[in-house]
């Protein structure tokens, strides 16, 4: 599609944002005519959305959100089919409930009736998929809809030291809509948490590469150093910087598109 967006620096990132918005529309049951895209003008977005839907239907495909949408529509249109599935699943357990969206929840509510034997597990402080339509407020309003429920709060944290947990709690406490909870770290105190801010990703990679190089010069083996990333895309700038500083490293990432991998990009740059 030839558009004014052909000169976008990172087309993959642009397409990922479009994909998230399509998922959000379906998960929230929004009509595309009433949706305003944050990635591109409405007319362009609708053209992309309609083209995507046309291709999916033409090839008899279903994406994940379609499976939820069609299930929801089927249950609403065919009470007899819904009744059959209600009898089959008398007890329902849902994990990561903080990431549920509106349509998924509406489908589950229908499926759980009339006994409403729902067991949900989640952490409202861990909801990070709002950009995909996740609605943590559903978990917060759950007790109002199911008044006879029993709530169990598990406060033991077996992953983090108390220093990490204390820093995280101090930050998340500013969220206005959350369940208040007391957490206890089971891994001891640990080292202090240091927070640093950088103007650009390049400046961040430069600073971290220098810190790692300094640690190695002081005798720290490289295999005792680790960097954690939220997405694989964030690793690319670090890999280039580590090679510049002759820092040995191993990347544990899943390759979805080989041509987006930094190794392939280096090869292509020579072609």
Mark where each language-model region is:
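Proline-centered turn/helix-capping motifs that create local helix->coil transitions or kinks
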Residues: 10, 26-30, 115-116, 171-181
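Helicase P-loop NTPase motor core
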Residues: 147-150, 155-248
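Conserved short internal alpha-helix adjacent to the catalytic or cofactor-binding core
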Residues: 243-247, 255-271
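Conserved helicase NTPase motor core
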Residues: 37-141, 156-160
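Conserved P-loop NTPase-based nucleic-acid remodeling module centered on helicase motor cores
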Residues: 1-20, 196
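Structured, non-catalytic alpha/beta "coupling" segments that mediate domain-domain communication
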Residues: 14-28, 163-171
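Short, acidic/turn-prone active-site loops that include or flank metal/cofactor-
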Residues: 124-125, 253-257
